Amino acid sequence: MERTQLFDLMGELKLYGMKAAFDEIMTTAVKRQHEPQRIVGDLLNAEINEKQ
């Protein structure tokens, strides 16, 4: 799925924290070869932090 499609879906679901942190989390994940579960966890934590 393209980045723009992901951002559209995150916006539609009102996942603004996840959307804001996406590029940084993905860049770090690629550099450090994070597992998919780690990436999803980091995105979810970004969303939780945004909502608090």
Residue map of PLM features:
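Charged, compositionally biased N-terminal leader segments and the immediate start
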Residues: 1-13, 17
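Interdomain "pre-motor" coupling segment immediately N-terminal to P-loop NTPase/helicase cores
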Residues: 7, 19-52
